[in-house]
Structure formats: structure tokens, C-alpha cells
């Protein structure tokens, strides 16, 4: 089972998503795909930045995100995940907080993180997959 990183979800929003990503997704059951609430928050933050420049575009992306949240398994940042996040962050002041939260979610739920940014997650001890390199 897989936890999609923010960059993978963003890729799917592109007019022409990368072929390798689409091919990989075709081989995975929807029931095996999960999102972290952190990813939803990161996308929403991008929407808010866009809203200041182009309200119509922001509304379009927000409607897409609403549909994603309604149709995908979104895993919360609960007590178990926050405790794992604290373990991952301990002694790593240069670690990106959001990446550590996504990794903690994956560790607690036994998921593989699907990301283009493998290097960002290597120190967290979670299984990783880069669908851009699966062609």
C-alpha cells in the first residue's frame, strides 16, 4: 500500500502528467492509495498563494482538491503519527517538517512513500518508490 507525496498528487493535476506516473498508477488499486492530511494542507497552502493572484484559478484547483479529498483515503495526523514524527525529528534540525510528517504517517500505517524526491525521505527509514523511474 502506498502514501502519495505532495509532488505526486500535484503531478496528477498537470495537463499532461508524466507517462511513467500514469502507468504506475494504472497498476495499483485505488484502495491501495492513501494521502496524508499534510499533503492536503500543502496543496491548500498553494491554493491560498494562487488566490491572491488569480481567484478563478484558485477556485478551480480547490474544487479539484475537494474531489480528491472526497474520493481518496486521507490519513490524519493523530497522536500515534505525531509521536512518530517527534521521533523522526529528534536531533535533525534541518529536516523539513512536512516531509517528516508524511514519513511518520507512512511508518505508522506501514505504507511506502511514493515521491519524486527520494532524497528528502531517505533518512526516515520508510520504503520509497519513485514512479517517474518505473518506465
What kind of feature is each model-predicted range?
Residues 24-27, 65-66, 73, 103-105, ...:
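Short secondary-structure boundary/capping segments
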Residues 1, 103, 108-135:
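Acidic, PIN/NYN-like endoribonuclease modules and their adjacent C-terminal/linker elements
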Residues 11-12, 24, 46, 84-85, ...:
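Residues that scaffold the ATP/ADP-binding catalytic core of kinase and kinase-like folds
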Residues 1-35, 49-63, 135:
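Short, well-structured N-terminal submotif of metal-dependent ribonuclease cores
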Residues 9, 40-43, 82, 121:
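A generic structural signal for short hydrophobic patches within well-formed alpha-helices
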Residues 45-48, 53, 59, 71-116:
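Active-site neighborhoods of divalent-metal-dependent phosphate/nucleic-acid chemistry enzymes
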Residues 5, 42, 99, 117-120:
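Acidic active-site catalytic centers that drive phospho-/nucleotidyl reactions
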Residues 2, 29-34, 68-75, 112:
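Short loop->beta-strand "edge-of-pocket" segments that line small-molecule binding or catalytic clefts
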